[in-house]
Regions:
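Interfacial aromatic "cap" segments that immediately flank transmembrane helices
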Residues: 2-31, 64-87, 145-198, 245-246, ...
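Long, highly hydrophobic alpha-helical transmembrane signal-anchor segments
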Residues: 1-24, 57, 62-66, 70-135
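Selective recognition of hydrophobic, aromatic-rich stretches within alpha-helical transmembrane segments
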Residues: 31-54, 85, 95, 121-165, ...
Length: 265
């Protein structure tokens, strides 16, 4: 394939709307809603990447969004990548056990699982960042994440989660343009590295404020502390995710798989 400047092209797509920051903020606020918000955002990003893969130039929709379709697309994506996510989670767990003697036992209830996932990710980022294996692990994760994004787009194209598990087909696409795939994964790795630095910095600030506020029972202060940490993290990771989906959508154009199935979000 002719060399494509995926990052600059994806950025140009995102910022075509002068109010693109509003879109990022909207998605970031949705990210604060556990499970339902996450599924909807995944579907939104998948639908935008699908449009890009079809050759449509334009920013993600900010108005007249088909909320139901984005949620359905998110459900398809989750179904199409759930097993891949389990493999990734197992890999990260092994890494965490390698760099730490601490055990990790998730709670069974729904809120406990969400809380455990957050603490697991926080522990992985903070502890692995202190280890010499951090960058190699980040490289593997970046390659794998983009594999899952391709799987999610395959599921969106076919409107069938089973398409996300056609590993042979996905690997065949990667083999046909390995350089492009590595190019995108390298930029994903850099973006994730920056995102993790932001996560670590904000977590340290939040931890310091929690220590300073021990004994304070003011609910307003607790909400402020929550937003001060979670919203900036959500903004950073939302931007990274949008850019990654856009770059993969651009990469998939060459295979002409998307057709013209869905012209709007």
């Amino acid at each position: 394939m002719q060399e494509t400047k995926y990052l600059s092209h994806a950025w140009a797509q995102l910022t075509k709307d002068k109010d693109w920051i509003t879109t990022i903020l909207m998605l970031s606020v949705c990210m604060l809603l556990p499970v339902v918000g996450w599924i909807w955002i995944i579907g939104y990003e998948t639908e935008w990447a699908l449009l890009i893969a079809q050759g449509i130039e334009g920013p993600p929709e900010r108005k007249n969004i088909d909320i139901v379709r984005c949620f359905k697309s998110g459900c398809h994506t989750v179904a199409a990548t759930l097993s891949w996510c389990v493999i990734l989670g197992s890999f990260l767990y092994l890494v965490l056990r390698t760099v730490s003697d601490a055990s990790f036992s998730p709670n069974i209830d729904a809120l406990g699982i969400i809380n455990s996932l957050f603490h697991f990710w926080a522990a992985f980022v903070i502890l692995s960042a202190r280890s010499s294996i951090f960058m190699p692990v980040l490289a593997v994760v970046s390659l794998y994440v983009n594999f899952m994004v391709i799987a999610s787009l395959r599921a969106a194209i076919c409107r069938n989660p089973a398409a996300g598990y056609q590993a042979g087909h996905i690997l065949g696409m990667i083999g046909r343009d390995l350089n492009g795939y590595l190019n995108i994964s390298g930029m994903t790795m850099i973006a994730m590295f920056i995102g993790n630095i932001v996560f670590i910095a904000l977590s340290q600030v939040a931890a310091a404020m929690i220590l300073l506020s021990l004994g304070i029972s003011n609910m307003v202060f607790r909400i402020f502390l929550f937003l001060m940490f979670c919203l900036p993290v959500a903004i950073v990771y939302t931007l990274i995710s949008l850019m990654d989906y856009a770059m993969v959508g651009l990469w998939m154009r060459q295979f002409n798989e998307a057709g013209s199935a869905h012209p709007h979000l």
